[in-house]
Regions:
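Conserved MFS/SLC helix-loop-helix module at the cytosolic interface between two early adjacent transmembrane helices
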Residues: 75-114
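Extracytoplasmic gate region of multi-pass secondary transporters
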Residues: 44-45, 222-274
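Helix-to-loop junctions at the C-terminal end of transmembrane segments
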Residues: 76-89, 172, 275-288, 367-368
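Helix-breaking motifs and short loop linkers at transmembrane-helix boundaries and internal kinks
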Residues: 56, 88, 109-114, 143, ...
Length: 420
């Protein structure tokens, strides 16, 4: 029995004014929430020199702040998913915003580094709840427009990720407590907009149930689909983090100055943000599988071109453009391909966070063996795996062709007796 028999497309929910999940004000507030979580994640890195001065830390100890944030993020995804459907969406999102605010304020006011790490963990817990909660609700809350809305939502994360370091540069890393306190205060107005979020969301009605002939799902096949989705998310987020972390080093190694390398890396992040805004109208015309296939193919070509020094800065910008839609576009595809796997979204989002954390050390080990100049080729090999995973998922989630109906045999013509 082919594995495609247990993971099929479903008919998306058509939203009506009575069934919509978000009011217009809540949509705007949700995008604002994603600006905040993007900024929060991006505040830690540029503030590390100030952490070291204030708490007399080694570089590795100072880096634990971001690690605590990511650990809290993974825990927040898993906790939110466990409570999703049991508690109302407003309560869960409101609790997540409050945890982020309390954690950020605690980090700003912490008297010792261990207290600061606990606060970063708390802020990360709220970060994970917002990240998973809004992604999950946007994936099911806009019917056929969900993919487009997810791209817009995640584009605002990129806006925050660009805004955070810019604020640190503007006010100085030594003033990081003021930035974290301002971030904490910015969470509070968003609580007022939660009245526009529906507490319970409509569930998609499968067009095909994905069950075997006897009515029970073939769990091995569904497990394979989920495993490949997880692999796709871990690998592409690893590429995203790998380019962001190692592009400046690679460009300097092939002859670019530090300023030019930093500018090119900023261009990569800008293109990734722009790519998600650009993908929104495309998502209304093309299926998620088509968008992700083109994205993986384009990303693979651009990483190959990045190995040519003269083309590298422009090729990395192309990587940002093509990688942009994969994360938000994959979630509706996952929900459609595995409608019975309720925790599938939490699994891939948590896995993507782990992939982002693991990408730096893993790529660093590979670079020790192959050299910095091999960075684009190493990432290109990972991108090729993303493309293969996408092609496998297209085959595995394709609805089976209906059996051809047998035409009834024509009835025999009556035998006419010869005329007398």
């Amino acid at each position: 029995v082919p594995e495609a028999s247990t993971a099929h497309e479903v008919t998306p929910v058509r939203t009506t004014p009575e069934s919509r999940v978000f009011s217009p004000a809540a949509v705007v507030a949700s995008c604002g929430g994603f600006v905040l979580i993007g900024a929060l994640q991006a505040l830690y890195g540029p503030s590390i020199p100030a952490f070291r001065d204030d708490f007399a830390l080694s570089p590795s100890a100072a880096g634990l702040g971001l690690s605590a944030h990511f650990v809290g993020g993974v825990a927040g995804v898993l906790v939110f998913d466990r409570l999703y459907g049991r508690l109302g969406n407003r309560l869960l999102l409101g609790s997540s915003y409050l945890l982020m605010a309390l954690g950020a304020a605690g980090f700003a006011l912490a008297p010792t580094w261990p207290v600061a790490l606990v606060a970063a963990l708390l802020a990360g817990l709220g970060f994970g709840g917002i990240d998973y909660g809004l992604n999950q609700l946007f994936a099911v809350g806009f019917g056929h427009r969900s993919t487009a809305m997810l791209n817009i939502l995640n584009a605002h994360f990129g806006v925050g990720a660009i805004l955070g370091p810019a604020l640190v540069a503007a006010v100085g890393a030594e003033h990081y407590p003021a930035l974290f306190l301002a971030f904490a205060a910015a969470n509070l107005p968003l609580l007022l907009c939660l009245r526009g979020v529906r507490d319970q969301v409509p569930q998609p009605v499968p067009g095909t149930t994905g069950t075997a002939a006897g009515g029970s799902p073939l769990s091995r096949s569904l497990g394979s689909v989920l495993a490949v989705f997880v692999a796709l998310y871990v690998l592409h987020v690893g590429i995203e983090a790998g380019v962001g972390g190692w592009e400046p080093t690679h460009l300097e190694a092939v002859g670019y100055g530090a300023g030019a390398a930093a500018t090119a890396t900023s261009g990569y992040w800008l293109m990734m943000t722009a790519g998600r805004f650009l993908a929104a109208p495309l998502a209304l015309r093309h299926s998620p599988r088509t968008i992700i296939t083109v994205s993986c193919a384009g990303m693979t070509v651009c990483l190959l071109l990045a190995s040519v020094p003269a083309l590298a800065p422009y090729a990395y910008a192309g990587v940002g453009l093509f990688i942009a839609p994969i994360f938000p576009t994959g979630l509706p595809w996952l929900n459609a391909a595995a409608p019975r796997a309720r925790r599938a979204g939490a699994l891939v989002i948590a896995a993507s966070m782990i992939g982002g954390v693991a990408a730096g050390p893993a790529l660093g080990k590979a670079i020790e063996w192959s050299g910095v100049r091999a960075v684009p080729l190493l990432l290109d090999a990972v991108s090729a795996l993303c493309l293969l995973a996408t092609l496998w998922l297209i085959r595995a989630t394709r609805p089976p062709s209906p059996l051809p109906s047998l035409s009834p045999l024509p009835s025999p013509s009556p035998v006419r007796s010869p005329a007398p």
